[in-house]
Each structure stands twice: as structure tokens, then as C-alpha cells.
């Protein structure tokens, strides 16, 4: 006995197709259609996580931890935990709000067009509330579990990033300079979480992270200069030169990369001069610095997208290793060493 048409309509979803130019109908169960859609559509949870920019968030957490450790004579793990959680909440919320503000620009760039907002997977109001919620929770968390100064630094970093750096991307080539201030705030937050103030040593850590951002983000700006130009963003000094590399193209960008990298290497020696670390760190910082400058010089000579990518990778390797040696070679840790 054949099932009636009513039964077929109730249990299946008819999807029209064409085979050899002849219209036809294929009956596909609703469960199959829904399953296929679920498989093809990225998870909403994954999309919300991506709004926090996990790769950047990792470096933020590392920098905060370094600030905590360098400020501590005997590290309180509870304080460290509060600092990491609070800073991660603020940074993640700031990143989500940045996604919301730049959703129109992101839709114009190839590398960002697939993000949750430009692709339509998430609604703007969802992202806005998510970003506000994370940010406020982070600031309040830092202020109540640690101290008011740490919360204020987090609030200042959030506001300067969203209200100064983000709009300046479309108006001024100084945006990278302005953005480097909130970008270096995590080490101050880590230090303030432990000490409740900001001594000279905290500003040395700040200077290291501040200068590191120039070769790092200018390399990204050069790699994706065509995308940024399409979106009207002035991320590099040579922003109006376009995507083609010629004899003069990138001269200002790579000159700034070279100078800030040189300054970074010099500033990286200051922890030794201030008695924060031992001579072992000095040797490590020198070796890392020379390696970074070698890559910078190669990129400056080449000025290609591939060279900029190598530089980007070098900066990503340089900073965590420098911080690692900084923490391992603290003077209180190696007080008994001959160095």
C-alpha cells in the first residue's frame, strides 16, 4: 500500500532540482535538512568565543601574568587568578565591542568578511550586549577582588581603545601609536594587582610591550595593506601607496619598524640595570634582540608580504620568550647564582 500524498507532505520536505534540464522533486526528510544545516553552520558558541580574539587574548593574559610575577616577592596564586580572569574579561569584551563598531569595515576586507557579524551569523545587538557584559564584569571584578587602581587601568584601556584608537584607524596614521597605549596596559594591570601602585619597574615592562607592538602590528598592516586600503583604514605610514611594492613603497613603514625594533632591544636591557633580573636575562635578551633585528633588516630590504609575514612570526616568538627569561631570571629567584 502506497502512502498518501498527505503523509509524504507531513514527513518530508520537497526540494526542487533539475536533472538534464527537466524539473523534478526529491523528497528529503526534515531531520536530514536540519542536520545538514547544523553541520554547515558554525556553532554560535564558537562564534561568540571568536569575538574575544583568542590569539590576542592569550598574549594579554601572558602579559598580565608577567606583571603579577615581576611585582611579587612571593606570588599569591589567588591574586594571580583574579588578575588573569579580570583582565581576560575586559580584553575579551573590548574585542567584542570592536567587532561591533567595525562590522561595516570588516565586511569590506577579505580576511574579516567571514567574521560572525559581517557574515550575518550573529546579530549586532547580540554582539553589543555580549561585549558590554564582559567588559563591565571584568572591570567590576578587578576593582572588587583586587583594587580600584587595577579596575581603573582596565577601564582606561577599554575607553582609549574603543573611543580613540578604533575611530583613528580611518582618520590618522597615528592610530598605531595611540593603540599601543591600551595594548601595553595588561602589564600595568598585573603589576597594580599585586602592588596597588605603579613603580618605575612597571613602566619598564610597559615600555617593552609598548614598543613591541610597532613591528608586530605594522607587519600585519603591510601584509593586509590592500584590505585596509579597501576599507579606508590608515594602518601604516604608507597607507595611500596601494598594494604594489615598488622602489619607494613601504619606506616609511619599514623605517618605523626598524627604529622601534632597535628601541625595543635597548629598552629590553633596562630590567637588568634596575635590578629586576640577573645577567642571565641580559644574555638572553641580547640574543633574542639580535635575532629580531636580523629578521627586521631582511624585511626592510625585501618589503614583500612574505617578508612581513616572517617578521610577524618573529615578533610572536620574541615576546613570549623574552617574558619567559624575564620571569625565570628574576633577582629573587637567582639570588644565589654567581651571575
Located regions from the model:
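Small-residue-rich segments of transmembrane alpha-helices in multi-pass membrane proteins
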Residues: 62-65, 116, 178-194, 312-325
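Membrane-embedded alpha-helical segments that form the functional core of polytopic membrane enzymes
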Residues: 62-103, 111, 135, 139, ...
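Intramembrane alpha-helical segments
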Residues: 124, 128-194
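Interfacial loop-to-transmembrane junctions
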Residues: 293-321
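Transit-peptide-like, low-complexity N-terminal presequences
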Residues: 1-46, 335-339
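Juxtamembrane boundary at the C-terminal end of a transmembrane helix
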Residues: 324-339
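Cytosolic, membrane-interface loops and tails of multi-pass inner-membrane proteins
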Residues: 31-41, 101-122, 218-251
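Multi-pass membrane catalytic core of lipid/isoprenoid biosynthesis enzymes
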Residues: 111-152, 243-272
